[in-house]
């Protein structure tokens, strides 16, 4: 029995297949394979596979960046990143829904109601389509 296990391990090493080569699936669209982070079949250049984690619908965060649907969100200070709900998060004094900054949101009173709805002291916010955030 021990001989067979040892033979199997030797075979894996000689075949250049290691336990670290196993593809790790992260959510529906992201994966890690052979030290690279992927969105679908596209490599996310610069993404760190050791710190990559799914944080919401199509949102991935590593130690340097936040990605939405495989695209790096610009001007993010990762040390100030805070997840507020499934699709809402804040960075510095800005509130975001997925990859969209919510203009004039009141950061002190902002509350997430569910994955697509939120409110602050001035208004309520509703997600409609990928590119449209409505407030009322």
Regions found by a protein language model. Give the residues of each.
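Intrinsic structural disorder
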Residues: 1-2, 19
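Sec-dependent signal peptide recognition
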Residues: 2-11
